[in-house]
């Protein structure tokens, strides 16, 4: 039996929209409008993503991956980390009441 990973990050992972806003847009000299046009989505969708109000979806990840030369998994894994953190924070009191099983 393997030992589970019980370590927990102390802070919320960086939202992929923040990565886009702080790293990718400046590095590629992109505006919101140019990014929206490049990936063929609305400026509103990009704005919501950049502000962390929208998640990177399975439909958006290949668009971003193609544009920036990385993988859809890069974007989805970043989003998954945020989603897991948010879910764990929302139910942490409930989870704390669960008694772990012990092996015989």
For the regions a protein language model found, what residue spans apply to each?
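Short alpha-helical DNA-recognition segment
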Residues: 29-48
């Amino acid at each position: 039996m393997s030992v589970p990973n019980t370590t927990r990050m102390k802070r919320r992972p960086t939202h992929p929209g923040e990565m886009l806003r702080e790293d990718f847009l400046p590095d590629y000299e992109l505006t919101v409008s140019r990014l929206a046009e490049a990936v063929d989505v609305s400026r509103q969708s990009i704005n919501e993503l950049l502000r962390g109000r929208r998640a990177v979806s399975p439909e958006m990840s290949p668009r971003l991956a193609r544009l920036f030369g990385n993988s859809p998994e890069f974007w989805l894994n970043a989003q998954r980390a945020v989603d897991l953190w948010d879910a764990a924070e929302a139910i942490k009191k409930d989870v704390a009441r669960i008694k772990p099983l012990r092996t015989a």
